[in-house]
């Protein structure tokens, strides 16, 4: 690969790292082309880009990032990077699900907002709620509160009317 092309790749990877909410490093040695295509399809479904990049080029792209040196141990053997642009935990869910049926895919490490997660923390990451799930829960909570306010107001009004009715009956 020519130097110009390498510099172009470094720039592309650095730009994707800067745009990503989560960066995941995986090892894919032994994964067939068909399985790799299937994995990429699964990543695309959740808005994640998965790309094979040489370790030296990833190191150069990470050079300007704070805390990037913490990812250096993960840059050994074959490396592919999953860029989680919209949701930082979406790649973890795909990696965990796919690696259950494909031993060749191994999670190396991840970085989410500068916090580095090791290979033993994949289950923790994959069980976190996605951005969409969090929004759904928040909307449900808000909806519950909003719908209960009229019921509370109606109950107070009903109790007031009953109390006034009782007072009126006593005065008669």
UniProtKB/Swiss-Prot annotation:
One of its GO terms (biological process) is translation. Signal peptide: none annotated. Coiled coil: none annotated. Gene3D superfamilies: 3.30.70.1730, 6.10.250.290. InterPro entries: Ribosomal_uL10, Ribosomal_uL10-like_sf, Ribosomal_uL10_bac, Ribosomal_uL10_bac_type, Ribosomal_uL10_CS_bac. Keywords: Ribonucleoprotein, Ribosomal protein, RNA-binding, rRNA-binding. One of its GO terms (molecular function) is structural constituent of ribosome. GO terms for cellular component: large ribosomal subunit. Forms part of the ribosomal stalk, playing a central role in the interaction of the ribosome with GTP-bound translation factors. Belongs to the universal ribosomal protein uL10 family. Part of the ribosomal stalk of the 50S ribosomal subunit. The N-terminus interacts with L11 and the large rRNA to form the base of the stalk. The C-terminus forms an elongated spine to which L12 dimers bind in a sequential fashion forming a multimeric L10(L12)X complex. This is Large ribosomal subunit protein uL10. It comes from Pelodictyon phaeoclathratiforme (strain DSM 5477 / BU-1). The lineage of its organism: Bacteria, Pseudomonadati, Chlorobiota, Chlorobiia, Chlorobiales.
């Amino acid at each position: 690969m020519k130097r110009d092309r390498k510099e172009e790749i470094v720039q592309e990877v650095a730009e994707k790292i800067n745009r990503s909410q989560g960066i995941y490093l995986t090892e894919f040695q032994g994964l067939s082309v068909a399985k790799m295509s299937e994995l990429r399809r699964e990543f695309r479904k959740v808005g994640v880009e998965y790309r094979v990049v040489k370790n030296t080029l990833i190191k150069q792209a990470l050079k300007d990032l704070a805390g990037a040196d913490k990812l250096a141990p993960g840059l050994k053997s074959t490396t592919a990077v999953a860029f989680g642009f919209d949701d930082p935990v979406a790649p973890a869910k795909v990696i965990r699900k796919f690696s259950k049926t494909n031993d060749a895919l191994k999670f190396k490490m991840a970085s989410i907002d500068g916090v580095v997660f090791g290979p033993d923390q994949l289950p923790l990451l994959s069980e976190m709620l996605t951005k969409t799930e969090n929004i759904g829960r928040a909307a449900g909570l808000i909806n519950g509160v909003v719908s209960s306010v009229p019921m509370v107001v109606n109950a107070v009004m009903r109790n007031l009317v009953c109390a006034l009715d009782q007072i009126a009956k006593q005065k008669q």
